[in-house]
């Protein structure tokens, strides 16, 4: 994340939460209903800043803002009360090692210009995944999750991602810390490893990727002396919105909604007021 960092700046985040903390203290958690009290637009610039780099095009950041708002409303719906939602937001930001010193103006502008906009499927909110760089094609939700409930996440071409300087990443791991026999068992239609055999045991591809610290589960395995080389394509899980691909579209004058329509062809951008949540 290419944003200025200053030690001990967690207080910046807390300043945004003070009005809601007082409400909880004096009125109790149950009385602080999310859908009535919590101003999502106020917290969104912080959330978006933790998800996408500041040097991206404004329309790309606006697309990410719509995604962030959609996912935030889902959290609110699931957790029901303010304390749980704020706690989860803070955990998410800390998990990215993100401590914001100054909110850059483009994040606030992106949130303001997309106020109330969310992504929906058949008029309902759905989880909206995103990643930094695809392997040239985003993944099918139905394939990844083996469920029709995620069929709204369609695989689309994103060949422009291959032009990114971060498209290819090599990770070298000493053979001694790996299973004696390791081989790829299956891939999905976008080329991401779905199953890997490790000494006869079947491991899920994305779990293996995270455990090994790989940038992507779209990888090949090569022997390199006493090490094994994992050559990874793309960055992230490959589902949904490719930030790099979307940014290249923005450079060609695509707006936020056009970008989202491309990466989520089954979904619609609506105002949250018209969505049952």
List where the protein language model places each region:
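Conserved, single-site charged/polar hotspot
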Residues: 1-277
